[in-house]
């Protein structure tokens, strides 16, 4: 038994199965306690996100962890098993380090997974299912993820349209904190854009949408103002940045509307990013002197370049994860050696205590002191050399010269 990682993810399982295997936040504490108690594992951490569910256990067998997962979610072996992957020992360590570093994510290098792994670890500590080994493993993993972020460029290049749009704005404006932003649309992409903008210090955001109720729901999260599409002409002159992504079949911003807004701005530059297909902003807007229009095609070329950059950085990150997983296993082995030494010393002390007690009893009964000491020395010697003698005999009979040599070295027989 050793460290075990069991899981399914976006590469091995459908959304339907991932939903069945996921653990809800309100039940995950009990699930981790059940996993630790039901299996031979004495430590357990469950990482459950929309793209993956993974179980990390110490001192467990892969088969029993898989069986527990099937039983917990009432899934058949045939349904789950084709989608499950499992790693043990050093490979389990390396896998966790790769996951936390974003090397196993749907979007290579995405940073959100590290936060999710940290949350899972915190919940496991709350549940009382983390001890020395998994605590050290996850702390080491967080250090590896930080090392990957600081020593490679895996997280610096935008690889989503939303992130690329905000990255472009950051390149054009020295600081986004003082800019006013108009977002057109209230779908998933615009919501992601708003999140990236908020993370970059933008405090003045207006969200325009066909249904203002949808925009208001999003605005509550980001402290933005919701308006209808018909109100855009009133708010456009105040916007330094316009990012649009709707499902409209016709353009929402025309050249005339933008030209009028620029005049009201006294020709202060305006960045417009159109990430809709079909376009939300007329192509002719790009002809205006103070309007800087970028489309989804412009962003896509940036994303492709950045993906190549991330893949190169990922190769460096893989080396870091591999090296650090080896170092962790060195620590595991040192821990095992400490345990072995402690057990060996305890066993030897028990033999000594037993024989000394017998010797003292004999002395108390008037036995000859010299004879008692000699008997104690002989018995102690015989008891202590019994196991090494058996090991030497077995290695010699089997012709195992390697083990024989190691035993001779360990017993100090080859000093001269």
UniProtKB/Swiss-Prot annotation:
NADP(+) binds at residues 185-190. GO terms for molecular function: glutamyl-tRNA reductase activity; NADP binding. Its EC number is 1.2.1.70. Pathway: Porphyrin-containing compound metabolism; protoporphyrin-IX biosynthesis; 5-aminolevulinate from L-glutamyl-tRNA(Glu): step 1/2. Substrate binds at residues 49-52, 105, 110-112, 116. NCBIfam families: hemA. The record marks 95 as: Important for activity. During catalysis, the active site Cys acts as a nucleophile attacking the alpha-carbonyl group of tRNA-bound glutamate with the formation of a thioester intermediate between enzyme and glutamate, and the concomitant release of tRNA(Glu). The thioester intermediate is finally reduced by direct hydride transfer from NADPH, to form the product GSA. Belongs to the glutamyl-tRNA reductase family. It comes from Shewanella amazonensis (strain ATCC BAA-1098 / SB2B). Gene3D superfamilies: Glutamyl-tRNA reductase, N-terminal domain, NAD(P)-binding Rossmann-like Domain. It is an enzyme of class 1 (oxidoreductase). The active site is at 50 (nucleophile). This is Glutamyl-tRNA reductase. GO terms for biological process: protoporphyrinogen IX biosynthetic process from glutamate.
């Amino acid at each position: 038994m050793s460290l075990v990682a069991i899981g399914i993810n976006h590469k091995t399982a459908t959304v339907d199965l991932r939903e069945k295997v996921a653990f809800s936040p309100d039940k995950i504490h009990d699930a981790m306690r059940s996993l630790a108690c039901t299996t031979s594992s004495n430590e357990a951490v469950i990482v459950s996100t929309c793209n993956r569910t993974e179980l990390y256990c110490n001192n467990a067998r892969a088969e029993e962890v898989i069986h527990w997962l099937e039983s917990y979610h009432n899934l058949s072996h045939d349904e789950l098993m084709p989608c499950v992957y499992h790693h043990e020992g050093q490979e389990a360590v390396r896998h966790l380090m790769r996951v936390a570093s974003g090397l196993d994510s749907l979007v290579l290098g995405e940073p959100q997974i590290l936060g999710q792994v940290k949350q899972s670890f915190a919940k496991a500590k709350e549940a009382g299912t983390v001890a020395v080994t998994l605590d050290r493993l996850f702390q080491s993993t967080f250090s590896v993820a930080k090392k990957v972020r600081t020593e490679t460029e895996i997280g610096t290049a935008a690889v989503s349209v939303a992130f690329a749009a905000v990255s472009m704005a950051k390149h054009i404006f020295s600081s986004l904190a003082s800019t006013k932003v108009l977002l057109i649309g209230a779908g998933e992409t615009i919501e992601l854009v708003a999140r990236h903008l908020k993370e970059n210090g933008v405090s003045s955001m207006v969200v325009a949408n066909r249904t203002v109720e949808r925009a208001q729901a999003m605005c509550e999260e980001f402290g933005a103002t919701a308006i209808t599409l018909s109100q855009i002409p009133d708010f456009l002159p105040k916007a330094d940045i316009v990012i649009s992504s709707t499902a409209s079949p016709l353009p929402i911003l025309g050249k005339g509307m933008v030209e009028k807004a620029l005049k009201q701005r006294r020709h202060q530059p305006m960045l417009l990013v159109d990430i809709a297909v079909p376009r939300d902003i007329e192509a002719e807007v790009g002809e205006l002197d103070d309007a800087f229009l970028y489309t989804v095609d412009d962003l896509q070329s940036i994303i492709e370049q950045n993906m190549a950059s991330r893949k190169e950085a990922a190769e460096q990150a893989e080396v870091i994860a591999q090296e650090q997983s080896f170092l962790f296993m060195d620590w595991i082995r040192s821990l095992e050696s400490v345990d072995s030494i402690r057990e060996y010393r305890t066993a030897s002390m028990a033999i000594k205590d037993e024989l000394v007690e017998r010797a003292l009893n004999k002395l108390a009964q008037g036995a000859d002191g010299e004879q008692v000491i000699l008997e104690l020395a002989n018995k102690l010697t015989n008891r202590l050399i019994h196991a090494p003698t058996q090991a030497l005999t077995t290695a010699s009979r089997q012709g195992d010269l390697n083990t024989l040599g190691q035993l001779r070295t360990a017993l100090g027989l080859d000093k001269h």
